[in-house]
């Protein structure tokens, strides 16, 4: 009996230690490096879109690091409102220039920037998903302190990590509403879901607990922001958009959770894109082409790196960036309702 108990305790301790090591590895691998995009990919700029103007802007975030981006606008356009955009994990805001241009052409100014540790902004590393909330709040304060934006309604817009940031910045002064596409509940949850959760779902809670601890050690009492709790606290209008085939921010464990609680809420509009994955603002064909393209390149890298590099040069960007007009129209109409005070 005693021996059996010792075996059980030892086995349990070994599992806990293994999950701790995994959580520490995941935390460091994701958060402790910069994200400058893929040097072989083309990231669109304002020059790629007729009539789109980009004015450089910069501002300071929480630790004095400079964040850089652009104010996107059309010449001689009286803007309906200012849209403040938070990008997703990885490449910086220029991975979304096509979508930003669509919003500008609909009559908005768009303030978009690169988060700490990403692309053109300062920071030796990403620090963590909670850092994005600090950065977005800094962007909002920058906009609130600029005389040129006085009297303009301000709308938050974000995708993935950016949507998480948006949902946790709703109560900043001057924000009239928000659009959140494919946002996750918390940083610790989404990391554990995408690592141990894929192979040993029963241990997801344990890795999440360790990740929460690491985030607390890094960000203090404001660590571990929770999008569900933040959305419960606001009365501002919010549009939630999810693809029900999303496996990056697992739909059943994130989007479906939001929709079960908030669909029908007076201030929340929900849109589920059937058959869409993590980029619901794209057409299904564009999502499929993107996945096939990058899967083929990844497979080729294992065989012949130089041939994989050559494949980047043959990417059909028009095909993989084709927007879903209905989704983008929904976003713009929602922003229109906010700018009109409806």
Regions found by a protein language model. Name each.
Residues 234-235, 240-246:
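Short beta-strand/loop motif that positions the catalytic acidic residue
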Residues 236, 250-261, 285:
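Short alpha-helix in the alpha/beta-hydrolase fold that links the catalytic acid
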Residues 3-60, 70, 295-310:
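An N-terminal hydrophobic leader/cap segment in hydrolases
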Residues 284-342:
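Catalytic active-site module of serine/aspartate enzymes centered on a nucleophile-bearing elbow/loop
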Residues 126-147:
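Alpha/beta-hydrolase active-site loop
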Residues 100-122:
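Conserved alpha/beta-hydrolase
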Residues 168-220:
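Hydrolase active-site cap/lid region
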Residues 89-102, 115, 252:
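The serine-hydrolase catalytic nucleophile loop
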